[in-house]
From Swiss-Prot:
HAMAP family named in the record: TIM_B
Catalytic activity: D-glyceraldehyde 3-phosphate = dihydroxyacetone phosphate
Protein name: Triosephosphate isomerase, cytosolic
Species assigned in the record: Gracilaria gracilis
Protein keywords: Cytoplasm, Gluconeogenesis, Glycolysis, Isomerase
PROSITE patterns (UniProt xref): TIM_1 (PS00171), TIM_2 (PS51440)
Assembly information from the UniProt record: Homodimer.
One BP annotation, GO: glycerol catabolic process
MF (Gene Ontology): triose-phosphate isomerase activity
Amino acid sequence: NWKCNLSKADIAELVSAFNAAPPIDAAHVQVVVAPPAVYLDSTRQALRADFDTSAQNAWISKGGAFTGELDAAMVKDVGAEWVILGHSERRHIAQLKESDHTIAMKAAYALQHASLGVIYCIGELLEERESGQTIAVCERQLQALSDAISDWSDVVIAYEPVWAIGTGKVATPEQAEQVHEAVRAWLANNVSPQVAASTRILYGGSVSPANCESLAKQPNIDGFLVGGASMKPTFLEIVDSYKATLAEAV
């Protein structure tokens, strides 16, 4: 997730590095790049086909008189496969403050009318963790999505403790695993055991080449939502580390 960063020249340089990397092994690993919307089309055209691309946001419904918004069908039209929805910055930045309901509406439209995969972000603020509300907050955010959709086959959940995003603070592998395990249990109890088993749950929050291996070894962590570290060629070290962890588990 490149967020609101990078110039056209920066992206060209980064894409060149990604294109020079060994094959992704897409049968076992997916790598999804989410550039700023203005660069989504050109990034999709420039990247190798074994990289997927994603928008960072989309509107709640079909396009129309919604200045500045992005119809999920437009994302699909330029060849992108995914959209990130509910990122903590969309939920909590004062000028945005997207509600659980709004995010769920966006997800439902993207899934049902644009056939995009949705990376649905959940996570707690520091004060919510300190008051013991982590699981309750995540379950509330999951319930909003469950109320809006019935087919979870194209949903990936990303748990991102807000206090760890861009701060250099990382949830310990044990802290992250505890939440991931609770998310999977919630899915089993409130959606279905099949959805719980098949849904990938990513961890996001200051993921780096230095800490990704210990996180990836946790049984319920199925990958990462990477921010700052994805804007450097060394992002490929995270990909390689995750692939190596998968190979060790076989």
